[in-house]
Amino acid sequence: GKDTFWYIKHVGTEYLPKLFSLKAWADRVAKKLPFMPHHFSEKFLQGTSKLMPKHLPQIMWDYRNQYEHHLILKMGGKGVEEAREYLKEYFADKSKGAYFECDADLAQAAMLLRFAVASAAIRYRSVHEKEVEDIVALDIALKRNEEDWFEQLPPELDNKILHKLYYGHFMCHVFHQDYVIKKGYNCEEIEEEMLKILDQRGAEY
């Protein structure tokens, strides 16, 4: 989503519908040309994104490599100092993780990344169509008092998945979960297996 990140940063979200229209037009034209690849626009954008400069500040890359889970906490008013004190005390124990406070540029980068990453699974499916069967997408809500919130799939199910992407809403236990399924597996059957697991956990979907 580096191209999406830069596009929104420099052009703005108000022009996104025009971008999507242009992508759709390019794909329609490409379908009429036998030498053009499937999902032309996605593959073209992914290719051009490799020529773009690094879009994230180094500290975000460091945290990406260091930690599996990341939380964007946006505070205002008196809550800023309250959060600052709480996080300082909580992460005094380094085994619990770490945090950093954003200036305006870092905050913008974090929010743009949050927006751009939402289409990551779709882009991956288009670019790696030979390895990907499809995407299983679930919106789930766990119990409010659920402490074991991170999903652990059984190996026989996990082995059918190339990548898992989780996007959550802090403190309400609502998640959007994208599963990129390996080529050759039945996505409907996999989804049914996942829903059975969610039923056992008392989740809603």
Q: PLM features: residue spans?
A:
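Conserved glycine-rich FAD pyrophosphate-binding loop
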Residues: 3-205
